[in-house]
Amino acid sequence: MIENPNEVVTKALVRLVAVPGLDSKAALITLDNGLDYKKPNSFGPAGLRSLDEAITTATAADPAFIALTGKPYIFCVGADITGMPLITDRAQAVELGELGHRVFARLKDSAVPTFAFINGAALGSGLEVALHCHYRTVSTGAAALGLPEVAIGLIPGWGGSQLLPNLIGAPGAAQVILQNPLTQKVLKPKQAAEMGVADVLFEPADFLERSLEWAAGVVKGEITVERPEIDRDMWDGVLFFARQQLDEKLHGAVPSANKALELLALAKDASFADGTAAETEALADLIMGDESRASLYAFDLVQRRAKRPVGVPDKSLARKVTKVGIVGAGLMASQLALLFARRLEVPVVLTDLDQARVDKGVEYVHGQVDKMVSRGRMDEGTAAKLRGLVSGSVDKSVFADADFVIEAVFENLDVKKQVWAEIEKIVSPDAVLATNTSSLSVTAMAADLDHPERVVGFHFFNPVAVLPLLEIVKGERTDDATLATAFAVGKELKKSCVLVK
């Protein structure tokens, strides 16, 4: 039996509630981990088993209906991901997927009506369990609703990829499952109602009372819930367009997005059993893959450390950056060029070994800018300015007046040391030399330089435009001014910066 020793168990507590107008009582299941809103409800193995027991208890009471709600401000914010890194073999991952499916399906297959009273944030498996219920009320005070799993290298693995598109259609499902996570967006209650995720909205002050009354009206046949008609003729076209967008933006760098897209396509014609079986297999693949493990690591850093970074020097020590140099002109370097130019609004110059590579890198940036204009995300005046900020050369002397130079070359220590040996002779003594290395020693990289104190790790996660984490790595001789500058630049780039030593 799969267990998570770190799980903060969200218990499912059952009480029978008298509802005016009904002969039988309603069974109200409340999700509550016993802590305040700062530690939200989540589903780990023990939490799922608690919900399973609660559904059994509720069903045995022969209620008029079963309703699921959460503790104050929080419905449920998803799976307890603290246990994911502890899964060591695929069989455990499959077991976790099947457990969630089995428990949630009991709400979908219930002989009595089931309702989700979404009183607060409902994310990930929190929204998935609500989708298994026959009806959903949502508080106008709910902070967020969504399926953000793709952003952390996973998929909606407990029915979301199959239920949502068949509830609101392929366009809305693609937005919630793919587009929103990759742009760090969620649904607000009004939008959830407009899309058909929520059947009705109520104000927070009397949310539970109004939800119970509304549910009674549904049970008695006094209230009819109309659902949007699903246009299956446009399903394939919507997903074809979504795949094009993913390929253009991510270049295959996010396997979870491709898995989610495949599951959305399957949801058009597959039975629910076949669809959820495919979900389990996809979830297991991703849990055991490098992408989800790296993404979960990054997510943990952002949640625990980026919000309260420790060891960051006084920001007054940071030097002003008026020009950025990038060594390399490949895909990563080109993504960095676009990010620096867009956020810092300073000249950015790329270099590489030959002009063809340089030209390709600059063309990539210009092409991305053109796409933003065509999609209405940028006006032509801003685009023209941005294009003018990015240039390239095979001559590294263009770095002479750069305040911040970052390398994105081959992941080899000798290669990177050679790069810095060349660059150090060109730039000013206090220019920051940043490395995007993911695994090499910053200290070793700087060891032979005249000014090792201005070398710092500046590690982005790919794709650069999507993932918020930025690891700033302090070498043994990195000084406070360099470190402060790195954090200041990271903040301007709108990244969540964490200090790594």
Which residues does each predicted region cover?
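Amphipathic alpha-helical segments at domain termini/boundaries
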Residues: 1-30, 128, 173-282, 293, ...
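Conserved CoA-thioester-binding segment of acyl-CoA-metabolizing enzymes
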Residues: 1-69, 105
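NAD(P)+-binding Rossmann beta1-loop-alpha1 motif at the extreme N-terminus of oxidoreductases
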Residues: 21, 307-368, 391, 475, ...
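Glycine- (often His-adjacent) and acidic-residue-rich active-site loop
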Residues: 38, 69-103, 122, 151-154
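NAD(P)H/NAD(P)+-dependent Rossmann-fold oxidoreductase cores
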Residues: 82, 322, 351-432
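Glycine-rich beta-to-alpha active-site loop
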Residues: 101, 106-152, 156, 328-331
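Hydrophobic, secondary-structure "cap" segments at the distal end of domains
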Residues: 161-174
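Rossmann-fold NAD(P)-binding glycine/threonine-rich loop
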Residues: 417-488
